[in-house]
Amino acid sequence: MLEPRGADIPILFLVLVVLPVVAYILLGKWSNISEKRVRANLLAQMAAEEALRAETVVNADRGVRFESVATENRAQRTRTKTVSAGGGAVRAEFDAGARETVAEQRSDSVTATCGVTVVAPVNNNELHVCARCFGPAKTRCSRCKSVRYCSGKCQIIHWRVAHKDECVPVESCSSSSERVSFEKDSVLYDHGMDSTMYSNNTTQAAKGKTSKSSVDFASLGISQNDITPQINTQGRKSVGKQHSSKANRESCRRDSATVFDSSDEAASAGGDNKTSHIKHKSRGNSYAAETNPRRHSVDSSAVQMNGQSFVSGMQESHKHENNLGVRSSFGCPNTQYPSNGTRTATLPRTGINKSGEQSCTETSKKGQVAAVSKTVRSKDTGISEESNGISSTMGIMKMMGLRNSTKHDDRYKNLKMLFPYEEFLKFFQCEVFDLSPRGLVNCGNSCYANAVLQSLTCTKPLVAYLLRRSHSRSCSGKDWCLMCELEQHVMMLRESGGPLSASRILSHMRSINCQIGDGSQEDAHEFLRLLVASMQSICLERLGGETKVDPRLQETTLVQHMFGGRLRSKVKCLRCDHESERYENIMDLTLEIYGWVESLQDALTQFTRPEDLDGENMYRCSRCAGYVRARKELSIHEAPNILTIVLKRFQEGRYGKINKCISFPEMLDMIPFMTRTGDVPPLYMLYAVIVHLDTLNASFSGHYISYVKDLRGNWYRIDDSEIHPVPMTQVMSEGAYMLFYMRSYPRPQRGEHNGKAPVHHSQPRNEMKEQRKPVNRFKPRADHKNTESSSSEWSLFTSSDEASFTTESTRDSFSTIDYTDVCHVVDSSSPFAIFNNVYHNVEPSPHNTVACRMFSGTKPETRYFVEQETNHNNTVVLDATPSLYPIPAPYPPHDYYDQSMYVNYETNPEFNNGQDQDRTYSYW
């Protein structure tokens, strides 16, 4: 065999290893050099463009060709020869007026240049003229670099006369390099805009034609062709290398914030021996411009000399949400809609009122900013606009070609809503009658899921939203979606047939929680929390998830509108009487039922009664600078639209169950358990009950069933696939585990005072588990760091029901002895008998006497109602005193309930018309 020689190995190494490495290094360096060269060329090009822009700003509106000056001089000489004996004075006045006109036009040009880029390259070989004597200019203003002078004397005189009020530094002006022409498709008002607002001069300027002054010099015997050419400061248009001094000013649309609606009009009053002068009046009296992330309110009557900011009539309007109007020097209100990082514009509208006087109407709007709806109230100061006088902000922004801002003021964050509350009100108040409950197949210990799904499908606002199928139309998820699955499930309820199956929901829920859907018996409450949390995450998925959305915005989703409420925790130091409050969102209430609790009202009373913090749970007061005894009290600040109450029947750690009978009302009054400073809720109507049927009082085994009231008001007992209609008495006699209540009318939209929570001033010494007042909430606020931060009720869907699990165990179960041997079942002969409290039993009256009794921790309260029965499905409607508030209104006034009324359960003189007898109600 032929073997390679030893001399070939170095050559092969050189060819196969060294040369590729060297080539790779050289190619890398060559690539870097090429990139640097391209970058250098790009920087040089950008520098050249910047220089061109600076030169454009300097010379665009000030460069006048020398031949135009010569034409003016010839016109002046002609007028001197033509005018009669009194012409000398007329000529002097005309010259002064012409100079004043040029000064005003240049002032308007300087103002227009700020915020609007005008790109019209000017030939450097042109001769510039002096701003005062119109002679050949040799120097220019060192500050604005836009006005030329022939000598220092002219510069000083012109500065004192006019230029000191109009000089604006170059740095404050915009440097954009694009031009915008007012074509037919550029910037237009909405269809309500009056076409007569634009004059012929403006129309000609939009078409790029030269406009002439409308000055009438007939009395002087001078033709308009002999007059000094008017320098239109609206912009310049260059055609090839020729530049006309009569070109119209153009506005720039690239990220520009100013829309000009102005056309210079000239009018003169002349006579034989009377002075004549030129007046220029702008149609657009004022405008708003913004060239920096900071907001600038621009007033046409006042511009600061430093050019950094503009003066307006109401420069501090951003401090007040309702004061959004900016008045100009002409008394015309201009509406400004500030937004950080966004250049906004004010479009003033003019009109003629009945008296013939010209007035300006404030532009009002109601729309969305950055795809988030917010409402702005406006006041009309002139004529009313067409239709309802409301225009969309997005329409204005699209009309002007502006982009949405990514940064906004903090004060507008409180007004943003991920899901409009008005849409939720429509879902809450709509009527759905074509749905009927259908059974669900037990997929293997799935009774807990079936009971929860049956309760959710009877939740009216959720069902109305799912029937609309608005989520599936816009859902971008490629994988399985819970909301889409629920929509399909609700749509199948409209069809008649056999039992449905929730196997798809259970199988996908297992990917979220490994313990759900694997065939083992689980807790219905845990499954409900999982469903609600999943729906909430889906609502936030489009915006990047829970971690990227502001906590305040997370409270404005559809799920929060339905199940979200607000809880207040108040801690009072018993030494210095210092109080600190904190507000937290809640999604449901978990109530203890041990001890003396025999009714739902008792459980709520125990939940809201004050608790002393002492011993190991002492409170650290910042004012006392130590651990002191304190008193803590929980109360509901805002009642949710859908109130979910969980009765804590399962024992913690022993797998036992409190199997006592807890009475609950069909109509629940939450006023005694509210803070009375926030929401004033109406009655809550019961629509679903989940019951846990056990054996041997054990929590690790059993069966879940549900009682639901369909949207027609009929009650059904649903046991997986079996459905049976039942009377109300059977529902009220069951040992409920979960209760679902819905408000009789929706909660008013949250105000700004509810958006901020006070900062707590104290920290706990030791972690403590408060099993007495557990509360489930969805999302902790990031700025809440206070005393109860380690308490169980402040965790995500708190582990307040730590015993509410049903995992199998080999431990011996025990039967919890009921605290009462008597099951207090409310007599349902009267629909109001459910309000009877165990402390004060009232015998049912044959005349259906209404005695609404609620007990709080300190004093009892009552609520009087007028019982009415409509013809629709025998629905009982509760109303307050007719003089206070009618039921059809969406929101009641704050004085809907007289909370200072002393308790009088048997009689009410107001209803009895002065008679000393019990008020009785009969059906009609």
UniProtKB/Swiss-Prot annotation:
Disruption phenotype: Narrow, serrated and flat rosette leaves, early flowering, weak apical dominance and reduced fertility, partially due to defect in cell proliferation. Reduced seed weight.
Tissue: Highly expressed in rosette leaves and inflorescence. Expressed at low levels in cotyledons, stems, cauline leaves and siliques.
Catalysed reaction, written as an equation: Thiol-dependent hydrolysis of ester, thioester, amide, peptide and isopeptide bonds formed by the C-terminal Gly of ubiquitin (a 76-residue protein attached to proteins as an intracellular targeting signal)
Composition bias type Basic and acidic residues, residue spans: 247-256, 764-773
Main location: cytoplasm
UniProt-annotated binding residues for Zn(2+) 2: 141, 144, 163, 167
EC number: 3.4.19.12
Zinc finger (MYND-type): 130-167
USP domain location: 438-744
Coiled coil start-end: none
UniProt keyword annotation of DNA damage present: no
Keyword entries, A-Z: Cytoplasm, Hydrolase, Metal-binding, Nucleus, Protease, Thiol protease, Ubl conjugation pathway, Zinc, Zinc-finger
Location of the region described as Disordered in the Swiss-Prot/TrEMBL record: 226-301, 317-366, 750-793
Subcellular location: Cytoplasm; Nucleus
Active-site residues, record numbering mapped to chain: 447, 703
InterPro entries: Papain-like_cys_pep_sf, Peptidase_C19, Peptidase_C19_UCH, USP_CS, USP_dom, Znf_MYND
CDD domains in the cross-refs: Peptidase_C19E
Enzyme class, broadest EC rank: hydrolase
Biological process annotations from GO: protein deubiquitination; proteolysis
Protein family according to the UniProt entry: Belongs to the peptidase C19 family.
Quaternary context: Interacts with DA1.
Function: Recognizes and hydrolyzes the peptide bond at the C-terminal Gly of ubiquitin. Involved in the processing of poly-ubiquitin precursors as well as that of ubiquitinated proteins. Involved in the regulation of organ size. Acts as a positive regulator of cell proliferation. Possesses deubiquitinating enzyme activity in vitro. The enzyme activity of UBP15 is required for its function in regulation of cell proliferation. Functions antagonistically in a common pathway with DA1 to regulate seed size.
Name by which UniProt lists this protein: Ubiquitin carboxyl-terminal hydrolase 15
Organism: Arabidopsis thaliana (Mouse-ear cress)
